[in-house]
Amino acid sequence: VELVKYDNKSDASEAFTLATKLMTSDGVVAVLGPATTGNFKAVIPVAEQNKIPVASGSATGDDVTVEFNEAGEVEYDENGKPTTLKEYAFRICFNDSFQGTAMAKFAANNLNATKAVVIADSSSDYGKGLAKAFVETFTEGGGTIVSEESYVAKDTDFSATITKLTGMDFDVIFIPGYYEEVGLIIKTARAQGIDCPILGADGFDSPELINLAGADALNNIYFCNHYSSLSEDPTVTSFIEAFKAEYNAEPDAFNALGYDLAKFVCDAIGRADELTGEAVKTALENTENFTGVTGSFTIDECHNPVKSLVVISLENGEQASATNVSLD
């Protein structure tokens, strides 16, 4: 397999241009990436037009592989196939709704929480989608949302929001957002005496979180992720050892997802009837029981992986435990 690499500079228009070049000039039979939801969605029309599959390791937006109707649901035909499926788009990561739902169940089932506060990033689809799924699942399970607060990306002062919460009665705080703001929110909450469990999603996963919040504040923290370095699974441990030997660094979830993505696509190329985009697409659709660093999965009818996630706990800023959570 020959690899052709380009840098989309985290820009949607650049991703579109490079995807076009890969498919029309370079003659590829599959494209890996882009990593983010917005950039990945930008290349899907190119994939559909040229009948070349694109697969992402980390685009978690719910509507990446299929469009939803006005009720927020996927419509199916009489054969059980989504009517608005993006035929040439695939991913190997779970989506935002899955994370929100899983963390709501974890709060109720593992932490015995019945009352929750949500502090969401209202400036991103990521934050809004996670918040919606968490609230729906938590309340459907009999829980109460005591308060829903919001912020926008780049905010730095959260004292007013946290002060408002100090007079309320709740068991957990769920913060669907990215580490840049999350670290400051946690730091402020702990400084004002709020010591309850604080929950989040894969946006927590960054070494910068400890720099922003401080190790002392990062206790009783739980967030879901695609994998944990605490795993004793031989597939995971061998990957970590090989990564450290090659790069002299600890691999994060994005490294693990990138590795699995390459293996996933190469596996499909090896199973394809011929080396064409259409044949590789069919092989990707027929993937069953693929074993990767981020877990084993089968591709479903919406081109999403059916897999579990890992809930990681932090104590003094370090990973203390990892719990596999499935929605089965």
Task: For each feature predicted by the language model, list its residue ranges.
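Segments of small-molecule ligand-sensing domains
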Residues: 245-255, 266-319
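Short, well-structured alpha-helical segments in soluble
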Residues: 9-29, 105-109, 156-169
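Surface-exposed patches in mature extracellular/periplasmic domains of secreted proteins
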Residues: 1-2, 33-34, 115-121, 148, ...
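Extracytoplasmic ligand/sensor domains, especially the bilobed periplasmic-binding protein
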Residues: 28-147, 197-222
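Extracellular/periplasmic periplasmic-binding protein-like sensory domains
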Residues: 61, 186-259, 315, 319-326
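Hydrophobic alpha-helical
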Residues: 37-48, 156-163, 168-192
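Short helix-loop-beta-strand segments that form the rim/entrance of peptidase-like active sites
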Residues: 1-10
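Residue-level signal for short, function-critical loop segments
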Residues: 9, 121-123, 227
